[in-house]
């Protein structure tokens, strides 16, 4: 536990130091840009190239009350197909380190299964309504059997959201079925993520979101709700968003943590 606390302390200190060394307030000439970027970041299919680097620290995981750290690298790349449509690629590359989760004294570290989502979304926004649909793919890239399902998976992916002044709210859903792979357990799982974000005119934002997964094969439901504060900053010539907040878990999944902390750094590449 001492090592876990030390790890969190170092991570928080790094983020605070990074924020202080960054330009903690955008200049007047950047206010409009910062506000616009904060709003675009709340929209999963915005025409904005970004690279979120998401750190998750989860505590009291499962019956052995273990610890799990997940680093999710999530590049988002929008591609203009024609005058009316965008295609947005969203990839989640998880790097996981956990202890006392599968057995007392156990330690596993490695790559998890990569998830690749594609959204096709109309460029024209009518009445503030934004939507996108496409496929989601699960790739069996885990380097340890306990860090992934070792299954190929595929399914539908969709989102809908409303842009209303400083607010953005909506939901993302998908469903994955496995169809091949060496893993012992088939996948039949639904994911649902409602969210609401308020973006201020200075580039700061507050998001309330929940991430829920229903495992139909095992009749397990698990998820968490979190509230996150974030701020658009500049570091030299690089624009980024820095943020984080607490998470509280719920559901009947026996490997749910009790609580956690999320810290994000998102590199921004506006056109």
Task: Label each region the model flagged.
Residues 8-17:
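Bacterial N-terminal signal peptides
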Residues 18-22:
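Sec/Tat signal peptide C-region and signal peptidase I cleavage site
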Residues 24-271:
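Transmembrane beta-barrel domains of Gram-negative outer membranes and organellar outer membranes
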């Amino acid at each position: 536990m001492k090592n876990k606390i030390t790890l969190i302390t170092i991570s928080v200190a790094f983020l605070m130091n990074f924020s202080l060394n960054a330009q903690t307030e955008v200049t007047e000439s950047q206010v409009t840009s910062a506000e616009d970027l904060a709003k675009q970041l709340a929209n999963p299919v915005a025409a904005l190239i970004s690279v979120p680097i998401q750190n998750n620290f989860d505590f009291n995981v499962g019956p052995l009350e273990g610890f799990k750290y997940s680093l999710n690298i999530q590049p988002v790349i929008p591609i203009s197909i024609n005058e009316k449509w965008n295609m947005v690629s969203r990839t989640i590359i998880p790097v996981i380190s956990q202890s006392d989760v599968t057995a007392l004294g156990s330690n596993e570290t490695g790559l998890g299964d990569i998830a690749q989502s594609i959204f096709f979304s109309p460029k024209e926004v009518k009445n503030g309504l934004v939507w996108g649909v496409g496929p989601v793919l699960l790739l069996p890239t885990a380097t340890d059997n306990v860090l992934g399902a070792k299954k190929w998976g595929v399914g539908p992916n969709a989102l809908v959201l409303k842009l209303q002044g400083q607010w953005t709210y909506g939901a993302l859903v998908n469903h994955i079925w496995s169809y091949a792979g060496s893993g012992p357990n088939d996948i039949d799982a639904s994911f649902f993520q409602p969210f609401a974000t308020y973006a201020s005119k200075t580039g700061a934002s507050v998001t309330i979101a929940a991430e829920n997964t229903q495992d139909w094969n095992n009749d397990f439901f698990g998820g968490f709700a979190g509230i996150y504060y974030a701020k658009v900053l500049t570091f030299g010539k690089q624009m980024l968003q820095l943020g984080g907040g607490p998470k509280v878990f719920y559901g009947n999944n026996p490997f749910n943590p009790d609580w956690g902390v999320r810290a994000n750094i998102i590199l921004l590449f506006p056109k």
